[in-house]
Amino acid sequence: PKPFLLHGVTASGKTEVYMRVIEAVLARGESAIVLVPEISLTPQMTRSFCQRFGRNVAVLHSKLSSGERFDEWRRAERGDAKIVVGARSAVFAPVRNLGFIVVDEEHENSYKQEESPRYHARDVACERARISNAVCVLGSATPSVESYHRALRGEYNLLELPHRVEMWEMPTVEVVDMREELAEGNRSMFSRALSQAISDSLDRGEQVILFLNRRGYSTFVLCRECGYSMRCPECDVALTYHAAGSSIRCHYCDHEEPVPLVCPSCGSRYIRYFGAGTQKIEGEVKRVFPRARTVRMDTDTTRRKGAHETIVGKFKKGEYDILVGTQMVAKGLDFPNVTLVGVISADTCLNLPDYKAGERTFQLLTQVAGRAGRGEKGGHVVVQTYSPEHYAIELGETYDYKGFFDEEISCRNEGMYPPFSRLILVVVSGKNLRVVEKYSTALVRTLQAKVRSVKEWKSIRILGPAPCALARVRGMHRWQILLKVDPCITPHDHNKLIEEMLEACPPPSYDIIIQVDIDPESML
């Protein structure tokens, strides 16, 4: 059977749909796999499934110890557990007699494994279901543009849940133009509307989620005297200030150093912190709302095993009033007493050099807004932005997915981006910048010659070579070549083109690393 795309608004009961199908699958003596995009969502999904199906549920994800993972793997393999819940690697679970696969929040880019072997769990799920003659359901409130396009073309069966359960209203959304706030003298990171809404929610004994997709305290550290920016010695990125431990840290290679007392360039003491991360938001909340019990959930606070469950559990029990977090808090979590969500900066994703920036912004706004009003009390969302006129924000304000899809698909068609092409990203990296640049240029010449020589390949567009958006990571200089390939060209031809390119133009030394990513999720 063709895969099903279940497009249901947040809190529309998609999990209940999955469970009812699984009940029917188990009654036929078959097994099921349920994929979730984040490890932080696994405990909540597991709890729901265990309450319904008891010991029939196994859990698989990377935070388990090897012994725990082995035990769960064996339970699935022996048939002791008929349902496997887990993150992307659970798609390979050795269940017996597979009848059903769910890919929940199918739009999430965390389903793509960026290390070798590269794969997208959604594609693996669809293929495994086809081979096993099983049913595959892709669920999302904000389906990926590619998946929705496939559904409209009839490659997927489209199912829709347009209303919340018990006809609860979607949260109201208020977009605040931060340019106007600044013009009227408000230099705080909280708009007046958000400050008032937080105060009102706390007075009513309700909970608040504040979302900012950037961890740390400040995004960069700068000398006001000479303009010197503290940068990672190994990567081409600014170091992020972390108040805990008073250090500056690289989020790509984990390089860490103490905050300098004077500028390393000019010796000035005018060192200042710019930008805001979740740590800074947490500190500001504690300053402005000192009586509120505040907790932060990001990569820094959830490094320890079980930290996700602890924070989520305590917040759900009402031990905290305000949850400050990154995208971890945007997905799938269910807190009935949360009536207010504040998006501190909707522009964080929007300004990334990535063709999916608009899509990611719309998805994050819709998903994080969906954490509010998941009960009888109703919900309100305050979105702070410097780009209120952008279609991703305008249409996110009204949850208009179809309107957003029409805008986005038009932009993709114009730029020949997926689904109107398949992308192949070739990244060349090495210690010596001149060698990397020279070899990247030689690769492009080789590709151009190959494309001209084969009739079926003449439609392929080659962009580059150019430095990657992150031009240096862990001491390695990085250049990229992007191929836009007609979707009609087969994966076999993709591989043939890459193989012939590397045969005709082998790397000049072992110091050069070549990474080939077909259908990259990010251009960063």
Model regions: which residues?
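Nucleotide-binding motor/catalytic cores of P-loop/tubulin-like NTPases across gene-expression machines
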Residues: 454-455, 474-477, 489
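Short helix-terminating capping/connector loops at secondary-structure junctions
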Residues: 204, 376-377, 455-459, 508-511
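A carboxyl-terminal module marker
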Residues: 445, 449, 455-473, 498-499, ...
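Inter-lobe coupling/hinge segments of SF2-like helicase ATPases
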Residues: 2-437, 441, 469-471, 480-481, ...
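Hydrophobic, Leu/Ile/Phe/Ala-enriched alpha-helical segments that form helix-helix packing faces
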Residues: 285, 368-372, 447-451, 501-506
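A subset of signal/propeptide-processing and intrinsically disordered low-complexity segments
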Residues: 490, 495, 512-514
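Short amphipathic alpha-helices in soluble, non-transmembrane regions
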Residues: 439-445, 493-502
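Short helix-capping segments at alpha-helix termini
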Residues: 53, 289, 450-456, 506-509
